[in-house]
């Protein structure tokens, strides 16, 4: 009976050692997973910063060009407004006189399709 008790004790100790080894392995695995996750996060952050820097650099070059385009468009708009304004003042009297002549010099005529019925 003592040998059975001793055998049971050995089995319990072996089971405890196996359980301890499993727990230790789980801890190491979790530690490696956390470390891998932290490294991946650091790599992702570094990549994101690099891409954002590239984007800002490209955006600055494009926006600089767009800023120049906006200035050119504004200048062209001012020139066209001045051109239209001078054209308006140049032809205003003549056009106004033509409109008044058409309004005052009415020549009443019957339409060609009009049929007079008595």
From Swiss-Prot:
Keywords: Coiled coil, Hydrogen ion transport, Ion transport, Transport. Residues 3-53 form a coiled coil. GO terms for molecular function: proton-transporting ATPase activity, rotational mechanism. Residues 14-26 have a biased composition (Basic and acidic residues). The keyword Ion transport applies. The keyword Coiled coil applies. It comes from the Eukaryota. One of its GO terms (cellular component) is vacuolar proton-transporting V-type ATPase complex. Residues 1-12 have a biased composition (Polar residues). Residues 1-37 are annotated as: Disordered. InterPro entries: V-ATPase_G. Belongs to the V-ATPase G subunit family. V-ATPase is a heteromultimeric enzyme made up of two complexes: the ATP-hydrolytic V1 complex and the proton translocation V0 complex. The V1 complex consists of three catalytic AB heterodimers that form a heterohexamer, three peripheral stalks each consisting of EG heterodimers, one central rotor including subunits D and F, and the regulatory subunits C and H. The proton translocation complex V0 consists of the proton transport subunit a, a ring of proteolipid subunits c9c'', rotary subunit d, subunits e and f, and two accessory subunits. NCBIfam families: V_ATP_synt_G (TIGR01147). Subunit of the V1 complex of vacuolar(H+)-ATPase (V-ATPase), a multisubunit enzyme composed of a peripheral complex (V1) that hydrolyzes ATP and a membrane integral complex (V0) that translocates protons. V-ATPase is responsible for acidifying and maintaining the pH of intracellular compartments and in some cell types, is targeted to the plasma membrane, where it is responsible for acidifying the extracellular environment. This is V-type proton ATPase subunit G 3. It comes from Xenopus tropicalis.
């Amino acid at each position: 009976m003592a040998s059975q008790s001793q055998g049971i004790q050995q089995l319990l100790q072996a089971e405890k050692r196996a359980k301890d080894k499993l727990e230790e392995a789980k801890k190491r695995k979790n530690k490696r997973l956390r470390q891998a996750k932290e490294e991946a996060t650091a790599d992702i952050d570094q990549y994101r910063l690099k891409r954002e820097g590239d984007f800002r650099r490209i955006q600055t070059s494009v926006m600089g060009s767009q800023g120049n385009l906006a200035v050119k468009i504004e200048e062209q708009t001012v020139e066209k407004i001045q051109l239209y304004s001078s054209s308006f003042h140049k032809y205003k009297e003549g056009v106004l006189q033509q409109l008044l002549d058409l309004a005052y010099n009415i020549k009443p005529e019957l339409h060609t399709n009009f049929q007079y019925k008595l």
